[in-house]
Amino acid sequence: MKILFQGDSITDTGRNAECGSTISIGQGYAMLIDAFLSKEYPGKYEFINTGISGNRIVDIYQRIKVDFWNLKPDVYSLLIGVNDVWHEFGQHNGVSAERFENVYRMLLNDTLKELPNLKIILLEPFVLKASATAEHWNEFKTEVDKRRAVVRKMADEFNLTFVSLQDKFVKAAQICGADYWLADGVHPTPAGHQLIADEWLKAFKNIVL
């Protein structure tokens, strides 16, 4: 069974992306999931990571054939949304909530026509107040919340598996502080990646194991 992870830097985590290579799984939650399932079920799963740092939903859609459909996965995992907000603050190149929803829906519609038996796991984007988010915190949080709502809506609309993460990070931050889990409010620490992996594995077990 082939499992494909796609997303932005949170998924990329330093993977080998040269010339479209999918050899490296990266150093984040995808690697932790790979390690656990490979240990528990030797030889059963193949893992591919095509996450690219800086990606927004429009970038994911733009490379849908080469980095997704052509790989013909059995399970597709998508975590996207924070750059659609973040890029507006620094580069004025964000993706509005309305466009985010439209492109997300188009991606799912087109994918399910192309790969009708595909199992899809949608991960909720998340954010905490820390160094990268504090300056525009209220707007940042409001806009990420809109993308979170879209992802949940898409999961409901297409009857797909949804992994809730924002509330898990908020609860965790009450114990040890935001930057213990998300170093800058966006990018997970090792503990943050483990939190994502744990929640992903719970969802995966419900639909596959």
Residue ranges of model-derived segments:
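Alpha-helical cap/lid subdomain in secreted, periplasmic
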Residues: 31-43, 59-209
